[in-house]
A protein has these predicted regions:
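Conserved ABC ATPase signature
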Residues: 151-156, 160
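Conserved ABC transporter NBD signature motif
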Residues: 65-76
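ABC ATPase NBD coupling module
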Residues: 77-94, 120
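Conserved ABC ATPase "signature" region
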Residues: 128-147, 199
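A short, flexible loop at the N-terminus of ABC-type nucleotide-binding domains that lies
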Residues: 2-5, 14-27, 58-64, 81-84, ...
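The feature captures the beta-strand-to-loop junction immediately N-terminal to the Walker
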Residues: 41-42
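A short, proline-enriched helix->beta-strand linker immediately N-terminal to the Walker B motif
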Residues: 171-175
Length: 207
């Protein structure tokens, strides 16, 4: 829906460590409407990534939401059942992770990585999913997507891995896309290209 609103309400997250409890996020609130671009700014270690991972329900096992909530259209997404979470994160909210080499399974080909989510969440035939996957790779200005689909992440450069990860996220047609420092490990020229590609895709898809 056009009037979707994703809210983080007074979020407080802590991690249990060998040195005791560490306050990772304290009293963070924000509101994101669909079709708008927002930047979360802060020093290294200030909780930007933890806030993103909390929205995605991907906190590490030693992390805990002490108080606050994350809601989509006023419905808490931190208290959903396993099935509801899979539907939400497959269809509504996607994420581009900071380190593509860690986020992409090295045992899978690019084709397998792209098709897995499309077939699982959108119930497409293999042929339909493959067409969407190829189009997503073309949108990221990746050369020879047919050949690229046969490769595994370790055979690709950092910039190509990052583009593949964005293509995977975009192929799912999410309403919201969270990008956690998506260009950190890349050179300045590639950084600019990828940020521009994300921006153009967000305008085209009303993310």
């Amino acid at each position: 829906p056009k009037n979707d609103v994703l809210k983080v309400k007074r979020l407080h997250v802590e991690f249990q460590t060998s040195h005791g409890m560490v306050h990772a996020v304290k009293d963070v609130s924000l509101e994101v409407k669909r079709g708008r671009i927002h930047a979360l700014v802060g020093e290294s270690g200030s909780g930007k990534s933890v806030t993103s991972l909390t929205i995605m329900n991907l906190l590490a096992g030693n992390g805990k939401v002490i108080s606050g909530d994350v809601t989509l259209n006023e419905k808490s997404i931190l208290k959903l059942s396993g099935k509801e979470k899979r539907q939400l994160y497959g269809d509504r909210i996607g994420m581009i992770f900071q380190d593509p080499t860690a986020a992409l399974d090295p045992l899978f080909t690019v084709e397998q990585l792209l098709l897995e989510g499309l077939r699982k969440h959108h119930r497409m035939s293999k042929k339909q999913a493959r067409e969407v996957a190829l189009e997503s790779l073309r949108m990221m200005n990746l050369r020879d997507p047919e050949e690229l689909m046969k490769k595994k992440p370790y055979e690709l450069s950092g910039g190509m891995c990052q583009r593949v990860m964005i293509a995977i996220a975009m192929s799912m047609k999410p309403d919201y896309l969270i990008a956690d420092e998506p260009t950190t490990a890349l050179d300045v020229t590639v950084q600019k290209q990828i940020l521009e590609e994300i921006y153009q895709l967000s305008r085209k898809e009303n993310l």
